[in-house]
Amino acid sequence: DYDSKNHTTREAVLHQQAEKLAELKASGRDVMIRQGNDYAAVQATLITDMDFDGGQYSIIDEYVPFYPLALHSRVSYTGASLNLADDAEEVLLRSAEVGAGLQYTLTAQSARVLQDSTYSEFYGADASLVLDDITAQVAQYRQALSGIFNQEMTGHERVGNVTITTYANGTRVYV
């Protein structure tokens, strides 16, 4: 809130938030953030809805997963919720490319009540309809990518339409 008697700069708020996140981490608590800024990422245990591109720049013709390269094995991260994504296959493949965990958004009650509401984007979140498929998808994903989640990402290259991500243990993931 704006308070004309007590101004707080963005820089001061940044430092306050960074201090609080550091305190939480130092106390042994897990810290989950959504997207997050650079100062928050270093204190996080999990980053959800991470932008794998690290921002869009019109002068760059090719995508380089800078944030995943910098953070992999140091912080766990996910992309968008697969069951709510416009293109779930694209999110799944990009997640595999950058060694991300999978994220889903679920409701315990029927999502039909959301159909004509301002929360209609959660219509695909009905756990009773998707939980079995999600369980199978997560098991397959974990099996396919076992051994990379705790490994530093050491390389990322594009060969034609295929990306190759290399990890410290020598594992290569082709997408």
Where are these regions (language model features)?
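Active-site-proximal substrate-binding groove within the catalytic cores of carbohydrate-active enzymes
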Residues: 3-175
